[in-house]
Amino acid sequence: MSVDQTLYSRTPTAMADPTCAGPAAFTAAGAFSQPDLMAFSLREEEPIWGFDTIAPSMASWQGKMEQQTFCNPNMERGLKNTHVRNGQPTPPPFDDKKLQTPMGEMYPVAQYAFNSSPPEYAPPKHRSSLSEQSQTDGYGVSTRRRKASAIDQCEQQQEREKREKFLERNRLAASKCRQKKKEHTKLLETRFREVSNKKGELESEIEHLRSEVLNLKNEMLRHAQCGDEAIKIHLAQMVRLITSKDTPNRDLVSPMRSPEQMAASTPHGLSFGFDGPMQLPSEMGSPLDQRRDSEQSIMTESSYTFSTDDSFEELINV
């Protein structure tokens, strides 16, 4: 196989691959002609032109393939000045540094833009989308939390205001209750003082009336010997009342008396549900009979004589 066949058989493959489609390939394909290639012969087993393309699976292969494919940018000039010795090409006889053109002028990068983006950049986009989604989720959660916290603060503020109002009402009610209690206490104190004063006045009036009664009784006793019938009757009633009151008092004053004496001191006129009063023996009731005789003698209308005046005055002053 000749070089011409090798070159034209592999050029479409190199052009078909978009990753290896560079300006050097187009320049080399347009610069070679069939008469120039027939000037020298090459072995078929020694491939000099690196037009074989490999579809890269990673982004790092792109730089390596460009270096291997376009290792000599001045391909046309090199092919014209190359001489083959012992089956291998020799370098050109003159310096290439003077004739080399910069890569930026020969191959402008802006004119050759790839249509499809490499698949290696898809995962970072996915990660960025996940991060953006997490950021949006976090922002939503934070906003919800802020709203919830704001609602809680509003509720707490309302509860605090309600409690303050309730406490204020309680304080007002307590102050009113204390004021009413003070007023009621003052009213009771004034009423107590008034009643106490009234009681004192009444007690003093009672004492004054008692003293007047005693004075009147004494004045009446002074006139007992005047012989007035009304005075004598009134004095007899007074003696009877005094004796009726004095008999139970004597029983209470002498606790050392025997039961027989207590039975003897009971009056004859007691009735325990019978038709007539119960009669006591004469032996036990002899002192009482004597006294009753004396009382009857005093109360008789025929005689109003007294034994002694001193005994009567003692009975009055008891």
Swiss-Prot record:
What cellular-component terms does GO give this entry? nucleus
Compartments in which it is found = Nucleus
**Induction comment from the UniProt entry of this chain:** Expression is barely detectable at the basal hyphal growth phase but induced during conidial development.
InterPro entries, per the entry = bZIP, bZIP_sf, bZIP_transcription_factors
Region described as Disordered: 114-157, 275-301
Domain called bZIP: residue spans: 160-223
- Region (Leucine-zipper): which ranges? 202-216
Q: Specify the domain of life of the species encoding this protein.
A: Eukaryota
Q: Where is this region: Basic motif?
A: 160-199
Function as written in the Swiss-Prot or TrEMBL entry: Transcription factor that acts as a key player in the regulatory circuit that integrates secondary metabolism and cellular response to oxidative stress. Regulates the genes involved in development and stress response through direct binding to their promoters. Particularly involved in the resistance to oxidative stress in asexual conidiospores.
Assigned protein family: Belongs to the bZIP family. ATF subfamily.
Q: What is this protein called?
A: Basic leucine zipper (bZIP) transcription factor atfB
Annotated organism of origin: Aspergillus oryzae (strain ATCC 42149 / RIB 40) (Yellow koji mold)
- Gene, per the UniProt record: atfB
